[in-house]
């Protein structure tokens, strides 16, 4: 059973600049670039189709920045202005033991910096820890239920369970949400979990807030 390797890169901006508030694609490109420079074969493995072997939290600024735009609208329209010396964190979770080993041995020793949309950041500190997904599931068995808030901080869609796969599900309907979660949990732990349909019968949405970027005509 694979462990999840969580790696945090603490970054410092070498110059001032601006980025979109949600920099998912830019962060992913920067991450795959530093992997490719250190180990091209590993970058191809991570970029290949099929089950995702990693999850990336986009660049998250901690100091030396301010958010502009998006007031009264979706934050997806906002931007981040930051100064030289601004601090940020990029976090990646690796879901495969061999990928984790190669990342730790081949990439981290030479990962001195990365470039996000033409803006350079130097790596100031690195931290890594292991998460046992089986213990996470076992720990949740004592949960007595009740309300649970779910926040999607990045644009998210679900693949339909039936029908034309080209049309995605934008609404976080419980069945599709649970199908995604149980599939990931089973792939990581091998534990047999209740069917998503059985879980969905016990859940209802009590409140919902969805925001999308404004589309120009």
Predicted regions, residues:
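RNA-interacting cores
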Residues: 1-217
